[in-house]
Structure formats: C-alpha cells, structure tokens
Amino acid sequence: MELVLGPLEARVIGALIEKEICTPDQYPLSLNALVNACNQKSNREPVLELSELDIRAVVDELIRKRLVVNTAGFNARVPRYQHRFCNTEFGTLKFSEQELGIVCELLLRGPQTPGELRSRTNRLCSFDDVTQVDAALAALIEQGPYVVKLPREPGKRESRYAHLFSGEVDLQALAEASPASSYASPAADRLSVLEEEVETLKLQLQALEARLAQLEG
C-alpha cells in the first residue's frame, strides 16, 4: 500500500471513524471534540494526552494528504473535521460495516485477537460469532493486505492481528511493548464499553450547550 499513517495520524483517523459511527449527530467533529476523542481513556491503547496544537498539526498533515477535510464554511469560526480515509465517492478504500469496525478498532487499540475484536467492536458493528470476525479479517488480508496475522504469543490460544496502514509491523518493538490491553479481562472490556458511553454522553452534552449558547446569543 502507498498509504502510510504515522501513529498520531492513525489515532485521528480512528477517532473520526468511531465518532462518525457512534455519534453521527456530533459529526464532523470540532477541534475540541477531536482532541477529546483522541485522548479518550476508554477504547484507546495507548492512552494519550495530546494538546490542540498537537492535533491541529496532525490534522493539517492529513488534510494535505487528502485524508481529512474541513467541512465548515470559509468564514466559520469553528472548523469541523471529516475523514476521507475510506468509503468515499472517489476513494479507493471500500470496507463493509464489519471490516470498517475491525479497521477502526485496530487503528485505536493496536493488535488484537479475533475474540477481542468481536467484543470491542460491538459499538461499531455486530458479529454473530468469532467465525464472522475471522471471515472479515480474511477479506481484509485478501483485499490489501490491510491487516496481518501476527505470530502467536507463547501461552496464548489466539493470534493477534494488526493493521498495515502504518507500514510493516515491527515485531520486536511490539513484543517489548507488551500492551496490557492484550490481556484485558471480560470485566475490563465491559468497563471500557461503559466509559465509551460516558464519553458519548459528554459529547452530546457539549453539543447541546453549544446550541443553547447560539440560541441565547
């Protein structure tokens, strides 16, 4: 693939895709909402603390790459950002709902097993069983490849999968990182879902407050 995303670019694209699906009423995102989405504590690995300046620099580069567009009018005070990463009229990347859910989750949390992907993508799409996850992963490998199956870790029953939108996976660096998310329990995943719902409610509240301020003004 010619497309290569840096780590922060992958985070921004993943966050935009997630919010497009989960909170369409607040999408496209303002810069502040995008910062909050990128720094979200749930469904993120690693958790980051990026500033508006950090995100603006990343967004500017993604706009240059034609992967993000500001949909606000020229004279608008608040920019609104929308991704053009995939499933656009003139773009080459086309994913099904399930494939997009997997891609989004891999962009936001890094390598994961099919079982983890099934439980963690439930806010983005639905899988009846792990077999459907395997089929979607196989399609992503065949089409691109856009994902890769990693060597199974010692003592683990399932292999993890990683996206290839940031280039080839550095297996040594990945092994040294040993992210805790790879060992998350079902209870931790349920907590993550609840935290995501709280973040969604915060975004909805911010949107309501902004509308109220406009009416009062």
Swiss-Prot record:
Source organism: Aeromonas salmonicida (strain A449)
Matching PANTHER family: UPF0502 PROTEIN YCEH
Family: Belongs to the UPF0502 family.
UniProt protein name: UPF0502 protein ASA_1460
Highest taxon listed in the record's lineage: Bacteria
Classification via Gene3D superfamilies: Winged helix-like DNA-binding domain superfamily/Winged helix DNA-binding domain
Cited Pfam families: DUF480 (PF04337)
